[in-house]
Amino acid sequence: MSFHASLLREEETPRPVAGINRTDQSLKNPLLGTEVSFCLKSSSLPHHVRALGQIKARNLASCDYYLLFRQVVLPPEVYPIGVLIRAAEAILTVIVSAWKLDHMTKTLYSSVRYALTNPRVRAQLELHIAYQRIVGQVSYSREADIGPKRLGNMSLQFIQSLVIATIDTTSCLMTYNHFLAAADTAKSRCHLLIASVVQGALWEQGSFLDHIINMIDIIDSINLPHDDYFTIIKSIFPYSQGLVMGRHNVSVSSDFASVFAIPELCPQLDSLLKKLLQLDPVLLLMVSSVQKSWYFPEIRMVDGSREQLHKMRVELETPQALLSYGHTLLSIFRAEFIKGYVSKNAKWPPVHLLPGCDKSIKNARELGRWSPAFDRRWQLFEKVVILRIADLDMDPDFNDIVSDKAIISSRRDWVFEYNAAAFWKKYGERLERPPARSGPSRLVNALIDGRLDNIPALLEPFYRGAVEFEDRLTVLVPKEKELKVKGRFFSKQTLAIRIYQVVAEAALKNEVMPYLKTHSMTMSSTALTHLLNRLSHTITKGDSFVINLDYSSWCNGFRPELQAPICRQLDQMFNCGYFFRTGCTLPCFTTFIIQDRFNPPYSLSGEPVEDGVTCAVGTKTMGEGMRQKLWTILTSCWEIIALREINVTFNILGQGDNQTIIIHKSASQNNQLLAERALGALYKHARLAGHNLKVEECWVSDCLYEYGKKLFFRGVPVPGCLKQLSRVTDSTGELFPNLYSKLACLTSSCLSAAMADTSPWVALATGVCLYLIELYVELPPAIIQDESLLTTLCLVGPSIGGLPTPATLPSVFFRGMSDPLPFQLALLQTLIKTTGVTCSLVNRVVKLRIAPYPDWLSLVTDPTSLNIAQVYRPERQIRRWIEEAIATSSHSSRIATFFQQPLTEMAQLLARDLSTMMPLRPRDMSALFALSNVAYGLSIIDLFQKSSTVVSASQAVHIEDVALESVRYKESIIQGLLDTTEGYNMQPYLEGCTYLAAKQLRRLTWGRDLVGVTMPFVAEQFHPHSSVGAKAELYLDAIIYCPQETLRSHHLTTRGDQPLYLGSNTAVKVQRGEITGLAKSRAANLVKDTLVLHQWYKVRKVTDPHLNTLMARFLLEKGYTSDARPSIQGGTLTHRLPSRGDSRQGLTGYVNILSTWLRFSSDYLHSFSKSSDDYTIHFQHVFTYGCLYADSVIRSGGVISTPYLLSASCKTCFEKIDSEEFVLACEPQYRGAEWLISKPVTVPEQITDAEVEFDPCVSASYCLGILIGKSFLVDIRASGHDIMEQRTWANLERFSVSDMQKLPWSIVIRSLWRFLIGARLLQFEKAGLIRMLYAATGPTFSFLMKVFQDSALLMDCAPLDRLSPRINFHSRGDLVAKLVLLPFINPGIVEIEVSGINSKYHAVSEANMDLYIAAAKSVGVKPTQFVEETNDFTARGHHHGCYSLSWSKSRNQSQVLKMVVRKLKLCVLYIYPTVDPAVALDLCHLPALTIILVLGGDPAYYERLLEMDLCGAVSSRVDIPHSLAARTHRGFAVGPDAGPGVIRLDRLESVCYAHPCLEELEFNAYLDSELVDISDMCCLPLATPCKALFRPIYRSLQSFRLALMDNYSFVMDLIMIRGLDIRPHLEEFDELLVVGQHILGQPVLVEVVYYVGVVRKRPVLARHPWSADLKRITVGGRAPCPSAARLRDEDCQGSLLVGLPAGLTQLLIID
């Protein structure tokens, strides 16, 4: 809200006016014309009289202001801007070379040069500069009237808040806001043109600047009435979407474009849009999404408010019908809530079942399960009432309340919203006013006044359902920058209602929304990005399509009757009287007035009178944005009912009225029919709920997806950088924008532009240009014309005391950098190397001066900061003023007493205490500091820095002082730049490795070594190389990227098959712990975090008496007096420290589409990723940097056809992170700050740390087994159509593989078995589990497979050696699946195994998992790799006939190759990827033979071998650096058909001669062209055969017999499960039967028919159809494997049949 009005009239300001006029520099308020029309009608206010004197005979209405501004023409080339071009080129060169991406230079160069020299762009730029100069001269000025000012051919006269613009004989009287709107439009167009030149240079279709210029010209020439003009502007974007869908939809039709009138109103624009559609649909969507460059309409207040008040009352349905439909919605809400609750907590919420409730619900509740049948039978839930699930949090955190919201103090104050002169003019009476306002008009002031000291008392009336009369008034405020001519309105309420709002919405957000799956309200922006990328991709694959719903005035449609039933249920869930129900009926008793200062309603005895335009007494809804969360829940409820009614599979994702529905295709109906039925049902149910769905404006598409202003075309985000960059403003909501805040705002806008784009380059290059333009407007010519000074200025960022700049914004590539200093030094190093800038100039600009004393407080708040003296920033000064102002105020409130404390001094004292840490670890200091009350106090002061708050908060701060303060800051920056003295010499720090330099620079400024802060700059630590010509040395430590196909420019905008990489999911290392019974307050959370950190330090072996003292003081100051130090589950460990964040989904700084074409992995960083130590590597940055390299090669015209790698280049950048111990050297002086937290915190005493005598490794393993089991059960129920990201239920992803390797997995697996036996699965759950494991799907199974990539773990895990002979497995995944299923395959053995776990561990709680893992880190040992054998040959061997791969086709080939290798006595063998992987695997098992695979940079073949191997042979015998570097062989090789040193096999035709060892030899072996004689080779004895080469079940007759019996009983169990496809299991069993028949000498049939089924509740598997109920299954292609022959020789007695079940014997014996 602006204060034009409030600061200008004496009658309305609380102190003598310091006449500051026009207090804004960019448009922040709605455009209203009422003051102008009042001025034209009456001449009662003195400045209105002055304004009327300036008007010409032809005066445009203020709403047509844009017609006049369109005619402004400037003389060409007024401003010299050559220096900007050269500086921009220099800056971009330096940035690009610092990142080692030099191939981008040319492309960026030409784009910047073209952008700043093209005459049209330049003219627009000069216009923008001219506007900004005027704005700078007239805003915040003491003179009321300024003028005339020239703007090209226009003259401007500023008279207080009014402006008269004149061209020739036409004038236009408008408000200052109208002028700002025109200035903003000029700025927006200037930015748009520059951004589009850069974008055009960087994408394959080439430049599209002409189209943009053409579009500007067409729009400026539209000569239509005001409303039609803005109708066109508003419909450009949706019309373009309609055009794209009309052309590119595949399975559904769309005539959305026909809704808009553009073709009739403006045919030129229509043809331009269609031309763009021809060129490229993405270009059309990108250009048309720019809506803020075409002026803003003035809001038509009378029509707008009349329509708004009408909508708040109109009734579509009768109240009775709404109430009954409300009850229907309540049933589905209960069903959805309980379903979500069960899947999250594995139990039902507390419920009360009414009489007549269905029996299936009772059963499900007792079992704590959810039956899928309830989805169809949701009506049953009308008999279920959910009881109390949580309490209302009655003491919301200050941070939630202290946003800068306007409130109206009480109902009596309504008259202060209007101008008295306007009332007199309209009604001819005086406006009666109280002598003063009854209270503050901003929330913050109410806080300072102590109105919020007792929130529960404020809310008490809502519990009773009786709201004070004084609170029942709402002001509807028009919203700014809206393209709707009739405007949108937001509510401004009284304090009590505002707080009620906060508490009710927070309760829903925290306790109800997380269980509902149909909205994105509780998702972080990163989680949402991941989700939308996934969704938009599924739509384009043809499996589903999307319906985008458009409700007409959604917010105004919710009637009290519809909400009453659900509100009653919410009151029961929170046990809070009438709290939620009060909210539904509140609008019926509230008076609404429209905020329009010059058009007041009539006042009758002090009350506003209803007139339907400016005032309404009692309506049916509260207006926009009030109960958003409740309404979102209701909307999704009726959508679910509608879609279930027509029986489709669907997902809903919605937030407010932005609802999208994804419908999956069905086998019986085509998509078009589904879409029409769905829309019909949705319309019907919306109507029942009293809403109107505009069906013709709902669109259906399978190529576009739009959600929350993000737009996707064919699964790829449409770059939003044009839209973002055209809206870059320098306004941050600051009271007075200063240089620092303007630049900071600009850099963060560039950041968000990059986030909306598929490449960071556009945002970076445009950002640099806009930054230079901003400096051009702000700084004097002396600085601007000095090119090297300007360049250096832009490359010195805040980390060494400079201004914020896009150049040091690595966040264009990554969001945030863990340590900005090395990057900053690398930039300056490159600057000196590549341009002619000298080091002394750098010293002059940086002026590094070490602060006179160490400022520990700044180190604690930002651990990466340097201790240097900087120019004092305005906000710090303003902050001091605020503190003083509040402290001197006379109020006695919690906040005032809080401010009277010496906050900053106490914070400095604590920081000084922490600085005695030896060694000095700033990250630990920061974590400790954050737990104190002082840190909390400082965070609250920061909230008070927002603009208007400050001014109104203290009568002492004048706007003028603030304005002067900003001027002072700018002047001191300018003085500093013009002053030629140099600061500290930076030369030594700009040479060599920046990681070391940064450490030294920190040491220099702080006087001590800082540990654990510096992180290397990624482009120095790793260098990109192509795999062509890469030597083996590069592969020693490398990250390898393999393109899916040859990548060219069109790959930058299409999706590949790899997952989209937006940064690793840096998983939470510790789950948020709950200390049960802790109240939900900020204090309690801080107590919890303190206890967690303390516990964490104990586990980390940091035991220091001073630290204990400090921790005790932290607890005491929060009112926690107990001595119990409970062991807690929780706290996240980031950078080796617990912090409060949840899982931080890492984010690259842009949408990294190219990553979907690249496979990459860090498995080949041998020294770092394989070790369990931690090193200074930020993997997320490294991975992103690799993708960025490919992106830049392609953008600069190259192609990527071969794999490439990032190899570790700077050895000093890798530093091992050592142990974390520290001590505090001195007794802490900090005594605590008790004044802050009002409620004492208690923790239930019964929690004690009983689990000390346990072995942490066993405890951790035991818990992990249970968590894996629970996650499996949740996975079974998850549907494949669920849109949320597939993560394990217990968040297992948070554990790193190196942590997992240190646990004894035999215990983990036994614990999992114990859990599965105890879980007593229902039939459908068992079937689900078996189906899921056989298909190898589900996040939990993927987690297990990731852990078991390490064969050593797999072999160590479970008593595999004892059990493997009983398991018939085919591959590693199959083995893991059967291992998990063992309790169902052979319950007897499993029970014996499980009983081995010591029963004392049953008391261990899996909630403490993280602490056990942390403790196990130091004691656990990694299992050693061991290599098992294959059968080997020697010249004089002893025949035993045991051959590897005995089941496979290539077994003989493999034996011959092994003989050749031994005959030739080879030490090194090259193998090409064309060789059968099984043979290669066998060769890897030969001892004393080094294998080199000819990979040529692509590790896929090696990974295949690793996956097949079940011991450590492949990983230990393949020389991986040489394999990756090898493109051809240099020695003996297997694979090619010819060439020197090639061993090849020739299959013999008919004559197979005997061989002493192999019965018949199928191959002759040749080396080059010579025959190798292998006739004398014979077997070596075999001790430990590898399970991958010799199936354990065929190893002896005994093991085969056991496996056969196990498998038989398992198949019989499976037959009992309804709805499970038995075929694959039967085929597996049949493999064993064939071998059994061969052993018994039975004839083996090629094809067999089985009859399967359940007869009299018993399973039947027979070869004869003796009952009609049996199902027939045919198994063909049967042949015994070669191992069978060996077993047959072994079984001469026929002992196989002894003791077999009769049914099994019948299957074996063929009659």
UniProtKB/Swiss-Prot annotation:
Gene Ontology CC terms: host cell nucleus; virion component
Catalytic activity, reaction form: RNA(n) + a ribonucleoside 5'-triphosphate = RNA(n+1) + diphosphate
Keywords, alphabetical: ATP-binding, Host nucleus, mRNA capping, mRNA processing, Multifunctional enzyme, Nucleotide-binding, Nucleotidyltransferase, RNA-directed RNA polymerase, S-adenosyl-L-methionine, Transferase, Viral RNA replication, Virion
EC number(s) from the headed UniProt entry: 2.7.7.48
Any one GO MF annotation of this record: mRNA 5'-cap (guanine-N7-)-methyltransferase activity
UniProt domain RdRp catalytic: residue ranges: 543-715
Superkingdom of origin organism: Viruses
Localization in the cell: Virion; Host nucleus
Motif interval(s): Nuclear localization signal: 844-852
Subunit organization: Interacts with the P protein.
Free-text function comment from the UniProt entry: Displays RNA-directed RNA polymerase activity. The mRNA guanylyl transferase and mRNA (guanine-N(7)-)-methyltransferase activities are supposedly provided by cellular enzymes. The template is composed of the viral RNA tightly encapsidated by the nucleoprotein (N). Functions either as transcriptase or as replicase. The transcriptase synthesizes subsequently three subgenomic RNAs, assuring their capping and polyadenylation by a stuttering mechanism. In replicase mode, the polymerase replicates the whole viral genome without recognizing the transcriptional signals.
Name of the protein this chain belongs to: RNA-directed RNA polymerase L
Organism for this UniProt entry: Borna disease virus (strain V)
